[in-house]
Amino acid sequence: MSTVYTRPLARLVEQLQRLPGIGPKSAQRLALHLLKRPTAEVEALANALIEAKQQVGFCSVCFHLSADPVCDICRAPSRDKTVICVVADSRDVIALEKTREFKGQYHVLGGLISPMDGIGPDQLNVQPLIRRVHQTKTQEVILAINPSVEGETTTLYVGQLLKPFTRVTRIAFGLPMGGDLEYADEVTLARALEGRRDLD
């Protein structure tokens, strides 16, 4: 690390750079901003980070982020338990929930099949999804997975496993190939949910 920074500041910049989307300049800007803030404010941020890391885990049913063994969505009696929307990541659950269109439940795979990265079906929450479909009265599984090469591979794999047991659909996309659900606006996501179709 450059001698421009004192050692504690250099460590802070280095740690901030580990965050996704944060390059050297952004890390420096954030570090300098934090140092200008009152100590109580910085301590509150540090405590919130530690508390979230210690208390937030994964729902035992759908694998979405949760501070409880079963998340609020899975516990909610108003949710349609016969429809499961399968997503790659909790960020996708958050994006879809913002549309206020989907009233069913979710299942978070925890990633996508990517042989280049050493991620196969066994590293994802695929088997718990299959068990869940078998054990519940699931009438439809909606595959809401990003339209990337890895996303298509995952969609086809999961779809083929589930088609013998339930209706499998995928959302229609107003996104280009390689686009991410997380960055789509609410209207695009809402239309994608409405325009879902059966998986061929």
UniProtKB/Swiss-Prot annotation:
Q: Which PROSITE patterns match?
A: RECR (PS01300), TOPRIM (PS50880)
Q: Which Pfam families match?
A: RecR_C, RecR_HhH, RecR_ZnF, Toprim_4
Entry keyword Cytoplasm: no
In its UniProt record, a GO molecular function of this protein is: zinc ion binding
Does Transmembrane helix appear among the keywords? no
- Sequence ranges assigned to domain Toprim in this UniProt record: 82-176
This chain belongs to the protein called Recombination protein RecR
Native organism = Acaryochloris marina (strain MBIC 11017)
Q: Which gene encodes it?
A: recR
